[in-house]
Amino acid sequence: MDRPEWTADPDLASRRVGGSVVWANDELFAERENLIKPEQPEFRPWSFGHKGQIYDGWETRRRREPGIDQAIVRLGLPGVVTGVVVDTAFFTGNYPPFASVEAVAVDGYPSPGELSALDWTTLVPKSALKGDSENPFQVSSSRRWTHVRLSIHPDGGVARFRVHGRPVADPRLLDLGSFDLAALEHGARVTGASNMFYSSPNNLISPGFASVMGEGWETARRRDDGNDWVEIALAGEGVPRLAELDTSHFKGNAPGWASLSGSLDGETWFEVLPRTRLQPDTRHRFPLEQPRELSHLRLDIYPDGGMARLRLYGGLTERGRSEFTERFRAAQSG
C-alpha cells in the first residue's frame, strides 16, 4: 500500500527506541506491550489459549456497559508527532470501530495515576477505523510530547500503534560539549538515502546496538558502477572528533569501503573521512584528524551492503548550542 510521506519519520513509540506501554485499563485477551513491538504483526490460525484465539496485539474484553478502553504509551523518543498509525492487522470481527489519540508533555517519570490526572491534548479526534488495516492519521502539532494515549471506542483489538515524528532532545539531559551529533534521540534525522530496499536508514542512528542484521540499514545489490549513500541532518552544528561505523551482524554483505563528508548547508560537501576499508561484523572507530564545523553528514558506502550503526561524537558550536536549545524551547510551547 502507498503510505503517507510522514510514515518515513521514525516511530517515537517503538520498543526498539525505548518506548513503553505504561498502562491499559484492560488487556484480557492480548497484552498491551504488543502495541509497540517493532516487528510486523503475525497471525497463526488455530493457536488457542485459555482465553481463545491468541492475537499479536492488544485486545480488550467485550464491553457490557458504556465506556472506552485506553492505553498510555511513554515515548522512547520524546518529540513532535507528525502522524500515527492504528494498525488492526488480523482483527476482523473484533476490531474497534473508532479510535482517538491524545498526548501530554511532562518532566520526569510520572506514574500511570499521575498521568491520568493531567490535561491531555487531542491529536486525533474520534475517527473511524477499518479492520485488518493500517489506519493512518496525520497530526498537525508543533509541540514536543512525552506520552501518547490511545483510546478505542468502545473495545476490541489493535495490533500495532505507531507514533511517527521528529525527536526533540532535552538539552538539560545532555553534555552539550561532547555527545553523538548524529543520534536520532538527540534530534538528528535522515534527509535522504540512495536505497532502503531491505531496511530503513533511520536504523543507522537509532539508540543502542543492533541485536540482529535487520536492525541496521541494508541496500539492494548493485549491478552498476555507482555506490549507496545516506545523508543526515545532525542534532546541531558541531565539530566532530570521532566517527564510529559499525558493521555488526553484516558478514557476507558488509560494504567494502566507506567515506564521510560534511556540509554546512546540505548541498556543498567536504571530506570528513576519506574512503576507508571496512571489515565485516566489526565496530570501527576513526579519530577525525582535521575536525571542521558541520551541520550535515553524508555516509557513502562502496559499492553497497549493510551497516548497523553510525555515530559521530563531538561538541556543538555556539550557534549549534543556541539552535539546539531554542528548538527544545519552541517545541515546549508549541
Sequence positions of predicted segments:
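A short beta-strand element within beta-rich, extracytoplasmic domains
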Residues: 79-90, 150, 239-249, 299
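Beta-sandwich interaction modules
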Residues: 78, 120-157, 227, 238, ...
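Intrinsic, low-complexity N-terminal interaction/targeting segments
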Residues: 50-54, 110-137, 203-222, 269-288
